[in-house]
Amino acid sequence: MGFCDRGVTVSEFKRFFDRTISRGPDDSRIIDTGKGLLGFHRLAIMGLHPEGMQPFELDGSYVVCNGEIYCFPRLKKKLMETGKYTFVSESDCEILLPMYKEYGTDMFRRLDAEFALILYDGDTQSYIAARDPIGIRPLFYGYDMHGTMLFASEAKNLVGLVWRVRPFPPGCYWKGGQFHRYADPGEAGPVIRGTEDEICAGIRERLIKGVEKRLVSDAKVGFLLSGGLDSSLVCAIAARLTGKKIRTFAIGMSGDAIDLGYAREVAEFIGSDHMEVVVPVKEAVAALSDVIATIGSYDITTVRASVGMY
């Protein structure tokens, strides 16, 4: 969460910031940049040690990021080769400030990542925010009564602080009071020529690489297995790539647990360490209000997918 001015005290900021402490139960921190406040709730995935805690700082600049930077080993190596940067953690997000020092806002188009970030530039004493091209990671913004910009991972952080909460546009960054587009998923690339077999092989290769880069984690990786095509493919690929038992989970409601059977078949086929969770219908219905409040959405598909996880 970020407040791009000193319009509130740290204690006031914390009151709104703590509405989403469940997003990061491992640690929490608020930094006063001198020109505003940055807050971060940590869910440790990469660089599990305290050195991986955000905000990261470099020469008076700070960054908070909810994201996964898939290309970070290559970028980190390139940055270290310049002789200008050293790193204190194994966190993928620690490369962001050095990347900004090297490339400015052009850094965003260089990232193979899903992310939402807020960056304070200590040299210009100004803020930048950005979101990945697809909008995988959530980010919201709004202006307070004085025209100050605020950002947060969830809309509920901003309720009571801004007059209107808006979703941050994917593929954009905000700088100098304006939004700038750095990526447009709607832009079609060149037409791929080839036979049907060649095109299918290309799809297969990309799918496998997409799963492989998401397996990099310092924390244990689990897989939600619904028994449908998508999750079954992902779990089968992961099991083959890791060469060991992966841990899969399936959630269903009592009286309508047909998906659990399909998930069980897949788990047996790939040899995973499988866990089933059956939720009584009454408990699922009773949880609806809490689920909607937690996810901050009335979207039917999102709510339906979230009840079992909750």
Where are these regions (language model features)?
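Short clusters of hydrophobic/aromatic residues that line enzyme substrate/ligand-binding pockets
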Residues: 30, 55-56, 87, 111, ...
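Residue-level signal for inorganic ion chemistry
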Residues: 24, 67, 96, 174, ...
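ATP-dependent adenylate-handling active sites, centered on carboxylate activation for C-N bond formation
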Residues: 4-11, 34-37, 81-83, 102, ...
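Acidic loop->beta-strand submotif enriched in PP2C/PPM serine/threonine phosphatases
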Residues: 45-64, 114-118, 160-167, 175, ...
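Phosphate-interacting basic helix/loop segments used at nucleotide- and nucleic-acid interfaces
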Residues: 103-111
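N-terminal segments that mediate ammonia production and transfer
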Residues: 2-6, 13-16, 22, 62, ...
